Amino acid sequence: MKRILLSAVLMSFAVAASAQNYYVDAQNPDMLRFGDYREPVRKEIVLPCQVGGYNVYKSDLHTHTIYSDGSVTPQFRIKEAWLEGLDVVAVTEHIEYRPFEKEFGEYVHANLKKDRDLNEAVRLSQKEGAYWDIFIIPGTEITRDGTTVGHFNALFTKDNNKVYDEDPVQAIRNAKAQGALVMHNHPGWWRTSIDFTEAEKVAYAEGLIDGVEVMNYNEFYPGIIDRVQERGLFIAANTDIHASSAEDFNKYEYMRPMTLILATERTEAGLRDALEAGRTLAYGFNTLCGNEALLVDFFKASVNVKKLSDKAYMLTNETEVPYLIQFGDSNPVHLSPFSTIRLEGTPEFKVLNMFCGKNTHPVVKLSF
């Protein structure tokens, strides 16, 4: 009897709790609305707000939509970026490869000029970006055979219709003539190494390349870190996204790679200045890559240090970046996101999930 009574009480609580998930619609009393409905909510990526006196902007410098070979609209792509915590998105549709135009229908082909306006995706993205407060970098991707030539993103283009040339290097020159910055994309894709193709040799020799992707989608090229350091280029990590991020990343619990831009302001002038100065970090796979000084500054901006005694101290990680630190040749120590660890000894260590070279890690020296 007691069990039956208890079950009835629990059931009544469950019904009451369930009922609280609904509310009567303000205009239609015959309609109940599910109470847990929410407006779109942005997932904030918790990183240092400033590093070395510069603001940290989370960006994706390589994206695609149905205006080339992506499977979503520009509007969807920009809203998606806002929901996932980004601040800056580059619109980089392929110039040469736009298969989805065939799917736009007979009406479109009959009523629009044959020569497509290759700036349309940028305009649509800028309009959507204004709504969601996402800064849009106009751009395009110069796309040729990945094994024998390579792919390059032109950023801050003025007119994408004037970039194409049959000669891929001349196409890069055309973009540079507009004031664009050129990023070498996924330098090992479809290849057996990251060695230069003949076209890439010419582009690099002429100083046409401003940055290189060290991470693209699920690819990581540690050797590129040395290249950007030696040549004074900016380093990047991007999605090269074609489908939705839910399909490409969230479903598999992959981290969306991003380029962290350290700039004075989120304007064209501010972002360009940062890229030209190489003030970027590549962030993906719980790994950070870039210049050693920038990495050290980023770590120090992420972690609060509390002195306990002459030998003991605590480190509190105030970001969502996990850190793996190593004192000398000892076993690594995990400093998980939003956690504190107690340590003793000399406050000098390597951060193993930070790379300032193919096989090198930054050394952090703390003072307190």
Residue ranges with predicted function:
Residues 140-144, 188-191, 241-242:
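Short glycine-enriched loops at secondary-structure junctions
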Residues 23, 32-181, 185, 207, ...:
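A metal-dependent hydrolase metal-coordination microenvironment
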Residues 12-13, 72, 103, 250:
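Alpha-helical transmembrane segments and their juxtamembrane interfaces
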Residues 181, 187, 196-198:
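His/acidic metal-ligating clusters that form di-metal
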Residues 4-13:
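Sec-dependent N-terminal signal peptides
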